[in-house]
């Protein structure tokens, strides 16, 4: 879990694909008489977001209505269109990466100053689209509900939360009571001092 983070082998594949898909995206929009400029590309762990700026006079709703056409033209499983991006003069179009890049716990932990004890209940949830560490303070949440379909990552999320707490607190600072009806998910934590 805290092994050294290997070099990202998927980055080159996703960077090359993003360049091709970005050019193709502008061409697809042009085919539907939408003139736009690609202004930025953000490659995240699972999706790539293209920020495009349509020419003056292009209705945002016209771009939204092209989701299925964009999906087919780019030959991707899904497309998400954020029109407009809040606070920006642009439209965001997200497509899945060819290769997903796993987010390692060591990457997240290394972003936090180990000497900073002001947020002992800070938990690591992953990375956002821009690759920034996503954290939240468990002590500031009145409630926390984790739900999802089978195989969607609920147990991975719980393990990330528990590991975050174990890495940042001492046994006299946090006590845990874990209830595991299946007697499978939390067995690795059976002998923790917390």
Residue ranges of predicted features:
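Short beta-strand elements
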Residues: 32-42, 77-84, 173-175
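Charged, low-hydrophobicity low-complexity segments
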Residues: 1-40, 97, 120
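Short, charged/polar, Gly/Pro-enriched secondary-structure boundary elements
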Residues: 56-58, 98-104
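P-loop NTPase catalytic phosphate-binding loop
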Residues: 36, 85-90, 94, 113-194
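Ordered, soluble secondary-structure elements with a strong preference for glycine-centered loop motifs
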Residues: 11-19, 57-65, 146-155
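Conserved glycine-bearing catalytic or ligand-binding loops at nucleotide- and phosphate-handling centers
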Residues: 67-101
